[in-house]
């Protein structure tokens, strides 16, 4: 897969279609991103530790079974099993494909909850129970 497909730098064309002046001869590798890593609902918890820019480490979730659910009435968190994904405002297709993103409504053992974390970036699924 070519990294240029996920280039995060400035566009090299003007709105009219003409070319802009180039700052360098080629696209900088540091400005090339990668495909989105959206976690799936699975039978186990699978996390990957990746090296990112600056030598830092980022934990990404690939498969997940449990979520940390905050219960506002009781003011406490519980680890609850995710039963299904009900809806995803970002993309309705994500719910059909069992992909979990921020804002997704999930069905857990304790009830319906909204995902508040970014699982592909944070490495954990945090959610708030819907009353």
Curated annotation (Swiss-Prot):
Residues 11-36 are annotated as: Disordered. It comes from the Archaea. CDD domains: Ribosomal_S8e. One of its GO terms (biological process) is translation. Keywords: Ribonucleoprotein, Ribosomal protein. Pfam families: Ribosomal_S8e (PF01201). Residues 16-30 have a biased composition (Basic residues). The keyword Ribonucleoprotein applies. GO terms for molecular function: structural constituent of ribosome. The keyword Membrane does not apply. InterPro entries: Ribosomal_eS8, Ribosomal_protein_eS8_arc, Ribosomal_Se8/biogenesis_NSA2. GO terms for cellular component: ribonucleoprotein complex; ribosome. Part of the 30S ribosomal subunit. Belongs to the eukaryotic ribosomal protein eS8 family. This is Small ribosomal subunit protein eS8. The gene is rps8e.
């Amino acid at each position: 897969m070519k990294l240029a497909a996920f280039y995060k730098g400035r566009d090299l064309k003007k709105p009219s279609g003409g070319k802009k002046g180039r700052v360098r001869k080629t696209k900088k590798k540091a400005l090339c991103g990668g495909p989105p890593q959206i976690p799936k609902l699975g039978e186990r918890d699978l996390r990957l530790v990746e090296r990112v820019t600056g030598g830092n480490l980022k934990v990404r979730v690939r498969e997940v079974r449990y979520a940390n659910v905050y219960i506002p009435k009781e003011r406490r968190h519980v680890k609850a099993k995710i039963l299904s994904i009900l809806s995803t405002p970002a993309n309705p297709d994500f719910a059909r494909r069992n992909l979990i993103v921020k804002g997704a409504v999930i069905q857990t053992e304790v009830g319906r909850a909204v995902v508040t974390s970014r699982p592909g970036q944070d490495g954990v699924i945090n959610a708030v129970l819907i009353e």
